[in-house]
């Protein structure tokens, strides 16, 4: 800037030239300058134009004063200049208007002896109008390339390029177009530049304040949108009003956590896995729901620690009925001092466990059935050999020593028998067979199932099958009495199935051992008798 100020005072003069040569020289320079700005239309111009030429005409001839101004070291893209364009536009607009009027009057007065006064004044009027219009556009800060040159330069017009008036960089950083002719001195230019940079700093501060205020407003709006889930919970009312027909859909039984319940319903026995509870009993959640994942992801609710009394009552209720109506669930929750949602979630989890154990038990029973079919194909005692407590009975039947596959299937059958909760009466009471101790006789389902009762019913199932097999082979030895039940007590009475007289007399002769292989159906045990009457009794025994 210091260099440019010092250059302002230097006005090297050129020798007098003829009037046509002067116009030709000016038109050539302006055309080159015009092409330069068209080529670099999207880039901010430098601080000063490479050529500023002002012409002063007199009656004695034409004298040309050309001042060549160098480019100081300055960044092309200065954000302060861009931001301060609108701030400094008002300062220069009035001053440029007076300078343009003064320049217009000087050109009209000095151009009277040049012979081209009408054309010169017309062109000057056009350019002054373009300058005013371009200064208004530049005050707004719009920089389209089409506004740089509203009309082409006439070759006889000697004023400076109008780009210095319409681009904010040219407006603020360049010397004004009439600096040489109208006498804008160094002090005025320095004051203008100082005011320009002060306005740029003020505009930058205002922009930062506006950005901070906008960010604060956006954060407040986001907090206002996300505030209701913080108070009421993300799913505050979901699942609190189940359908009147039942508890919940079977497809959504398993809920490892108390997801569908509001944490405000936790009782005194509730504990939190992530920080305990606050004073009101609500669980303290980790994280904030005002985050981006607050509305999309459910917060983990606290687990309920049930007491022994509550668990025993819930288990007894679950043995009676697997599904609760809304009224029954509310009564049970009131009785146990629990929330309705906690009882519902416990029932969902318990039903899932029940179904899983049922599937495992049925799978093991299917394995045992497949083993029975396998033994039928390749000989041996199919049922007593598979039962782990019938080693002596198998020896009495003349069974071969057990192999590895025998041991595997015996263990599978024992595991199936020891499964505690069977879903319903898988081995229903049969009137012709007296089942062991602790098991009710009759077609109705059992009131409850324990490990011993399940084992007794499974033992009676295999013993009745062995009795049917011995009835099919009258010449074979009779089965041995089974050992006592696991649950303790006397051995069950009447385990051997009586043979009806009419079926024994009317039975056909026994088939040879080469019977066709039965179908390996995992859903039900294979057929064990040729007698149609015994087959119908077996169908009555298994009510799945």
UniProtKB/Swiss-Prot annotation:
GO terms for cellular component: nucleus. GO terms for molecular function: DNA-binding transcription factor activity, RNA polymerase II-specific; RNA polymerase II transcription regulatory region sequence-specific DNA binding. Residues 53-73, 92-179, 236-308, 471-544 are annotated as: Disordered. Residues 247-262 have a biased composition (Acidic residues). Residues 53-70, 106-131, 492-506 have a biased composition (Low complexity). The keyword ATP-binding does not apply. Keywords: Developmental protein, DNA-binding, Homeobox, Nucleus, Sensory transduction, Vision. Belongs to the Antp homeobox family. This is Homeobox protein B-H1. It comes from Drosophila melanogaster.
